[in-house]
Design a protein with these regions (language model features):
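Beta-strand-centric surfaces of beta-sandwich/beta-rich domains
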Residues: 1-236
Length: 236
C-alpha cells in the first residue's frame, strides 16, 4: 500500500532529494518531515523554502509534470491535505503533507520521478529528516482515500481504514483498535521501527504514523482511547 520513494534523508543546508517509482498505481504522495533533536525546528513558514517536483516519464519519452510547488502552498491548498504535530510548548515538530492525484498508473517501464528540494536555515539545528512515500492501491472504481481529522474521546468507527495518524504515543491501553471481534493495542499492529511501512510507526517523533497490517486493510476499524486524542485517518 505504501511504496518508498525517498526514505529518511537528512536535511543539511540546501539539498535535493530524488527517488523513482514504477510499476504502481498511485493515488497520493505522503511527504513526511521528522524533526531531530535540537532547540530550533522547521516551522510551517519554513516550508515555502522546500519545493516538490513530481514528473511522470512514460516509456514513450513523454513527460508530464504533476506537481511543481513549494510545500507551504501544497499544505495550504484546498485540493491537498496537511497535518502537523507539536511538542508540549506548541512548537512544530513534524509535518506530513498528503497530495491527492486521483489515480496515476505507472507502468513497468514508466517512472514517477519525485524531487524534494529542502532548505535548512542557519537557525534550524534540529537536523530534520525527510521521507516521501507513494500511497498505492488496487482498489477499483476510482476509490479515493480521504484524510480526516478527529478528536476521539472514547471510541470512534472509521470506515475502511488503511492508516491512522496520531500525535499521541501508541502504547499499552492508551490506544486500542478493534476490527471485527478483535481488540488489540496499537503495538499489536506495529513493529519496532518505521521501515517497510506495513504495521509500522515513527518512533522518533511526537507524531506517530500507524500503517495497519494486511489483515486490517480495507476493514472498518474502531479506535478506542481513554481520553481525548487527536486522530488523523486515511480511509477509502
Amino acid at each position: 500500500m505504501y511504496k518508498q520513494i525517498i526514505k529518511n534523508q537528512s536535511v543539511k543546508g540546501n539539498q535535493s532529494h530524488q527517488g523513482v517509482l514504477n510499476s504502481a498505481i498511485v493515488n497520493q504522495l505522503l511527504i513526511y518531515i521528522r524533526q531531530g533533536s535540537g532547540n530550533t525546528y522547521y516551522q510551517a513558514s519554513d516550508l515555502d523554502d522546500c519545493n516538490l517536483l513530481v514528473v511522470l516519464r512514460r516509456a514513450t519519452g513523454e513527460e508530464l509534470t504533476l506537481v511543481s510547488a513549494d510545500l507551504l502552498s501544497l499544505a495550504n491548498y484546498s485540493n491537498y491535505s496537511g497535518g502537523y504535530s507539536y511538542d508540549a510548548a506548541g512548537t512544530d515538530k513534524g509535518f506530513n503533507i498528503l497530495l491527492n492525484f486521483g489515480k496515476v498508473v505507472i507502468g513497468a517501464n514508466d517512472q514517477l520521478v519525485v524531487t524534494l528540494t529542502t532548505a535548512t536555515g542557519a537557525t534550524i539545528d534540529s537536523s530534520p529528516v525527510v521521507s516521501v512515500y507513494g500511497v498505492t492501491t488496487d482498489f477499483e472504481n476510482d476509490d479515493i482515500f480521504r484524510y480526516l481529522f478527529y478528536n476521539v474521546n472514547g471510541s470512534m468507527l472509521f470506515k475502511k481504514v488503511v492508516s491512522i495518524f496520531s500525535d499521541s504515543s501508541p502504547n499499552g491501553a492508551e490506544f486500542l483498535i478493534q476490527h471485527g471481534n478483535t481488540q488489540e493495542t496499537v503495538l499489536d499492529h506495529c513493529a519496532d521501527a518505521f521501515s517497510d511501512l506495513t504495521g509500522k510507526y515513527e518512533a522518533n517523533s511526537t507524531f506517530y504514523m500507524l500503517f495497519l497490517d494486511q489483515t486490517s486493510i480495507g476493514q472498518d476499524v474502531t479506535v478506542i482511547t481513554p481520553a481525548s486524542k487527536r486522530i488523523l485517518a486515511i480511509c477509502r
